[in-house]
Design a protein with these regions (language model features):
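Active-site mouth loops of central-metabolism enzymes
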Residues: 7-10, 36-49, 115-123
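Short, glycine/serine-rich, charged loops/turns that create anion-binding
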Residues: 10-11, 42, 68, 96
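Active-site neighborhood of phospho(di)ester-bond hydrolases with catalytic His/Asp-centered motifs
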Residues: 2-8, 37-39, 65, 146
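Metal-associated gating/positioning segment near the N- to mid-region
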Residues: 1-30
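Short, intrinsically disordered, charge-balanced linker/junction segments flanking boundaries
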Residues: 2-3, 168-170
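Histidine/acidic residue-rich metal-binding segments in metalloenzymes
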Residues: 50-169
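Generic hydrophobic, aliphatic-rich segments that mediate packing or membrane embedding
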Residues: 19, 23, 31, 49-52, ...
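Acidic-histidine catalytic/liganding microenvironments
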Residues: 30-32, 164
């Protein structure tokens, strides 16, 4: 491994410039891999108050994310995307509706059933993804969507790209 994107859900959360600077300093000192910190989109990943993205970029962050913690308040999500768009920062989001996904641990389907795992319905991903893409259309935010698991989600991504939304995915 030569490069690592470090998500913000560390302990402590990567929501302060000093923490990011320390992470970059330690990684450089070890000289084992290139480290690319992904800063917290909101303070403490709580989804309430925006982090100081400009300061976090100065400290070394390459993008912003909520890690596995969705922002439930779409007003906060919109403000975060608008702020990120103003500076050209990329926002990484995992599309999952926490209410529809409650109790699930894997994409709902044949494999989950065979393994006896409680499933997360595709609708959980699609509904959250639709919201994220609409907010990106409205704000001009650059998105990276993580951990997609359904063909319908890929179709939404393709349509958004055709409409001019700057979105990548994995």
């Amino acid at each position: 491994v030569t490069s690592l994107a470090i998500p913000p859900d560390t302990d402590p959360v990567l929501d302060e410039p000093g923490l990011v600077e320390m992470l970059c300093y330690r990684a450089k000192k070890l000289n084992r891999a290139h480290v690319y910190p992904v800063g917290a989109l909101t303070i403490g990943l709580k989804g309430q108050q925006l982090s100081e993205m400009a300061e976090l970029v100065e400290a070394g962050c390459v993008a912003f994310s909520q890690a596995n913690t969705p922002i439930l308040d779409t007003r906060v999500l919109g403000r975060a995307m608008q702020y990120a768009a103003t500076f050209g920062f990329r926002v990484w989001l995992q599309p999952i509706d926490p209410h529809l996904a409650r109790g699930g641990v894997a994409h709902d389907g044949e494999v989950a059933s065979r393994l006896g795992l409680p499933g997360i319905p595709a609708s959980s991903e699609i509904i959250a993804l639709f919201t994220y893409l609409q907010m990106a259309r409205l704000t001009g935010a650059r998105l990276h969507i993580t951990r997609l698991s359904s063909a319908d989600s890929l179709a939404l991504i393709d349509q958004a790209r055709a409409d001019g939304v700057d979105v990548t995915c994995d």
